[in-house]
Amino acid sequence: MPTINQLLRKKSSRQAPKLKSKKPALAGCPQKRGVCFRVYTRTPKKPNSALRKVAKIRLCNGIVVIASIPGEGHNLQEHSVVCIRGGRVKDLPGVKYKVVRGRLDLQGVVNRKQSRSLYGTPKSK
């Protein structure tokens, strides 16, 4: 246990460590715009089995990221302009971002009744 004099002498040594960002490509922003240059499927890690839809996106700050496309069905192609947000997919290594549905070139999920705001679906009449 240090004495009070030792603490006063070394003020800087007892600072909390700086936390590394989990979403460095967003650069502190809630969302970022980017252009798709590859849309493809990936298989998840071990106990799960599926073909998860992902897109490789070049952001407006020049960083290239892989983002998941949530929901059933999508209309993304090469050169589509999309908006991405943070949020990883637990069974896809390296996928730390999600595409925002219903914004820019990506349409919302069709016939979605619950959790519509997450999937960009307008209210049905």
UniProtKB/Swiss-Prot annotation:
One of its GO terms (molecular function) is structural constituent of ribosome. Residues 1-26 are annotated as: Disordered. InterPro entries: NA-bd_OB-fold (IPR012340), Ribosomal_uS12 (IPR006032), Ribosomal_uS12_bac (IPR005679). It is found in: Mitochondrion. PROSITE patterns: RIBOSOMAL_S12. Belongs to the universal ribosomal protein uS12 family. This is Small ribosomal subunit protein uS12m.
